[in-house]
Amino acid sequence: SDIAIIIISIALMLFLGFLMTRITKKLRLPNVTAYIVTGILIGPYVLNLIPQKIIDGTAFLSDIALAFIAFSTGEFFRFSTIKKNGPKVVIITLLEALLASILVFVVMYFILHLNLAFSIVLASLAAATAPASTVMTIRQTGAKGDFVDTLLQVVALDDVVGLIAYSIAISVAMVSSSGTSSNFMDVVKNIGFNVLSLALGCGFGFVLKWLMPKKRSTDNRLIVSLSIIFLFCGICAVLDTSPLLGCMSMGTIYINITNDDKLFKQLNYFSPPILLLFFVRSGLNFDLGSLTNGSEAVGTTPLL
């Protein structure tokens, strides 16, 4: 039955992802590597153990996993820390994001001669850093200190820059590919949705604080926090925008008005299976054919 297929598929993704970490641990590789490799191996291009309808039906995991990661990074944006490291973090973020984007655009457009629209979008994507893999690797190694705090702040701000850059780039690329005149309102609308997400996240941070009195039991704290994060993800899905910025601002507001780091620790205990499924699913979606076959990539240039 369909129910049996769903349950067995999720069980396989979880257990095989765990087994692969036993191998990567011997090689001193992060668990994220194990999860992605597992997804590739059990995916449609190798063993084909997971039906395509399961892969398509778990698309929501991406938003939920990113929401957990973004909320947890908010813990590192205490106002006292921002005052101390703010200028340094901003300079590092802008330099690495802008230089990466410029380099990718030069290579894609002037060297590989890909079309302008695709080159612009790829350049904007180069500005972003994957927060999930960074946070999971830090958790796995137990790393702490000023460097880790600065790294997480840079990764978080980097995604702010990346999302804004992508919002602009995708609008410019659509205009370029369609040959129509530039519509400034499309750019403003995309940026506006991200700003709205930030504002809503701040509001949800205050709501979360109001719903978390000190007498609230541990179980109910977890239930309430999950319901708020899931609700916010749903609103972002309706607005067709990423929950990343909003959940980041939610976590930032919550930690600064409550100084309650216990909630973040609770969510850290709950999130590993979701993050494992997210990365395994990323591997399942990986198109091995596009690495060497130019006809499956954009233009005629293979990804490899």
At which residue positions do the language-model features occur?
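Interfacial helix-loop-helix linkers and transmembrane-helix boundary segments
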Residues: 24-31, 49-60, 75-92, 114-116, ...
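Alpha-helical transmembrane segments and their lipid-water interface positions
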Residues: 35-38, 47, 66-70, 100-108, ...
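Core mid-bundle transmembrane helix pairs that form the ion/substrate translocation pathway
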Residues: 10-11, 18-19, 157-163, 167-273
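Structural signature of hydrophobic alpha-helical transmembrane segments
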Residues: 1-12, 54-70, 116-130, 189-200, ...
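Hydrophobic transmembrane alpha-helices of secondary-active transporters
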Residues: 36-43, 59-85, 170, 174, ...
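Short helical (or helix-break) motifs at transmembrane helix termini and adjacent helical loops
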Residues: 66, 73-77, 99-104, 125-166
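Entry/N-cap segments of selected transmembrane alpha helices
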Residues: 5-20, 78-109, 116, 182-204, ...
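Hydrophobic alpha-helical transmembrane segments in multi-pass integral membrane proteins
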Residues: 48-49, 103-106, 162-171, 231-243, ...
